[in-house]
């Protein structure tokens, strides 16, 4: 029973409790009205920090996915341009194959050349004009790579590079060596000794892309031998370097040779790397060496050799798979028989007669080394056999502007150039496609990560309505009971009046 009237302890305590309940009820009301569990740092300091960090990550993930979408759009534009370029290269290749057919007359080949030039110009224009948001995509601008930032952290980026596919940068790194010829009024063996360009000593090395080779013994300089080494070397195979060899030996218009009485004419043919004759033909007195006869004699003894003799426009033509062709002609007797080696190898200017009873000549095959990247070469010691003014160096690109299909040789070279160019463009297109797939996978993963991050933030920051409504109801009932009890507490001092009656 209260016996003092200046201080109502019960009312004061009830009032304090009422204010606390009011504060808690109001906060619960705000949570229900905003949907937020954390209204200020005072509500949950550590929770607010974690939620804000999660929100920051979520924002970064969202923008990163936008970046990916922008990048995919740009890459799709680039891929479309590269696809057009590939289609035009394929058409150019088709026309080069057509031009390689010798049934075409010069006018037909000229028309094919014009078509190829128009397609080449179209490729140049596509590569120069394909862009996204002002950034050129196919002219080499992106050659060194750009970064696509896909995540919420500074290190979360992907490098994307697209090589230059302009016509001036498409082609092959080509070392096109033309086999040379030489001759002497001497034996074939001495010819090789005199001009060492046509002889590869076992102490000499050939080098391609830093890979060197030496023959086990001294051999005749031979394009087929070098091509076989290049194509068979594992290191060069891994680099993608390939080689082709061919040899077409054409003589001057054939003039029948009559062997005089008392004379004998011996013709020896050397094929490939060997200094031993592969074919020996002997014509005695009274024999007439016609074009048909020498062709028949050569072919009958060429079994096992990559060699065939034939007639073209009244000339002797000897073809090999790149093997060097050497010839040694000797005459015995004092008759008036003469034989010009130019009938076998045009341009050697050697004639066997009573004055010069022996002469030799050699024709090395052509060698073509090709790759899709630059490489070094070193032919020191045999450079003269292939017409190289620089025995060593670095091979530069032979681009689409170098294509000329107005000859059979040019058309076949164009096919090699276009094959490498098409491979490069197809590789670039494949890389773009792989990058798009990679970016799409990253996008999907980051989208899931964003959803999970948002959910984690939601658990910390946002209110659980079921739980909070229970809390609000509790505080509301407390307020109602508190107000009622405060009224009762305020009435307690009035009981003192009973003592004053």
From Swiss-Prot:
Keywords: Bacterial flagellum, Secreted. GO terms for cellular component: bacterial-type flagellum; extracellular region. It is found in: Secreted; Bacterial flagellum. One of its GO terms (molecular function) is structural molecule activity. Its main location: secreted. It holds the Pfam family Flagellin_C. InterPro entries: Flagellin, Flagellin_C, Flagellin_N. Flagellin is the subunit protein which polymerizes to form the filaments of bacterial flagella. Belongs to the bacterial flagellin family. This is Flagellin. It comes from Aquifex pyrophilus. The lineage of its organism: Bacteria, Pseudomonadati, Aquificota, Aquificia, Aquificales.
């Amino acid at each position: 029973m209260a016996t003092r009237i200046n201080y109502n302890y019960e009312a004061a305590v009830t009032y304090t409790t009422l204010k606390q309940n009011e504060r808690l009820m109001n906060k619960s009301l705000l949570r229900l009205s905003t949907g937020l569990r954390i209204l200020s740092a005072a509500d949950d300091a550590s929770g607010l920090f974690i939620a804000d960090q999660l929100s920051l990550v979520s924002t970064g993930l969202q923008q990163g996915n936008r970046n990916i979408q922008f990048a995919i759009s740009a890459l799709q534009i680039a891929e479309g341009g590269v696809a057009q370029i590939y289609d035009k290269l394929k058409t150019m290749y088709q026309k080069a194959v057509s031009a390689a057919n010798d049934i075409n007359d010069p006018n037909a080949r000229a028309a094919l050349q014009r078509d190829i030039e128009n397609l080449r110009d179209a490729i140049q224009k596509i590569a120069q004009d394909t862009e996204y948001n002002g950034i050129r995509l196919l002219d080499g601008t992106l050659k060194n790579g750009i970064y696509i930032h896909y995540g919420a952290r500074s290190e979360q980026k992907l490098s994307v590079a697209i090589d230059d596919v302009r016509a001036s940068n498409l082609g092959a790194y080509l070392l096109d060596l033309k086999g040379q010829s030489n001759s002497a009024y001497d034996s074939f063996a001495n010819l090789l000794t005199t001009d060492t360009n046509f002889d590869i000593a076992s102490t000499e090395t050939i080098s391609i892309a830093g890979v060197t080779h030496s023959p086990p013994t001294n051999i005749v300089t031979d394009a087929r031998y070098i091509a076989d080494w290049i194509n068979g070397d594992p290191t060069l195979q891994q680099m993608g370097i390939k080689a082709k060899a061919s040899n077409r030996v054409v003589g001057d218009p054939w003039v029948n040779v009559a062997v005089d009485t008392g004379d004998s004419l011996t013709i020896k043919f050397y094929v490939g790397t060997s200094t031993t004759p592969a074919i020996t033909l002997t014509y005695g007195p009274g024999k007439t060496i016609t074009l048909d006869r020498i062709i028949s004699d050569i072919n009958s003894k060429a079994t096992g050799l990559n060699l065939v003799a034939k007639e073209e426009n009244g000339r002797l033509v000897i073809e090999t798979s790149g093997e060097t062709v050497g010839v040694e002609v000797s005459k015995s007797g004092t008759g008036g028989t003469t034989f010009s080696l130019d009938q076998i190898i045009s341009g050697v200017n050697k004639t066997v007669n009573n004055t010069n009873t022996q002469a030799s000549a050699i024709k090395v095959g052509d060698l073509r080394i090709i790759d899709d990247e630059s490489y070094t070469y070193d032919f020191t010691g045999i450079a003269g056999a292939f017409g190289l003014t620089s025995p060593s160096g670095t091979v530069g690109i032979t681009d689409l502007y170098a294509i000329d299909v107005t000859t059979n040789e040019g058309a076949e070279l164009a096919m090699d150039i276009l094959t490498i160019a098409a491979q490069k463009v197809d590789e670039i297109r494949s890389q773009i496609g792989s990058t798009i797939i990679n970016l799409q996978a990253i996008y999907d993963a980051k989208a899931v990560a964003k959803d999970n991050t948002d959910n984690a933030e939601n658990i910390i920051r946002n209110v659980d309505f079921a739980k909070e409504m229970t809390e609000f109801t509790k505080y509301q009932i407390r307020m109602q009971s508190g107000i009622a009890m405060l009224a009762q507490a305020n009435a307690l001092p009035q009981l003192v009046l009973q003592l004053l009656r």
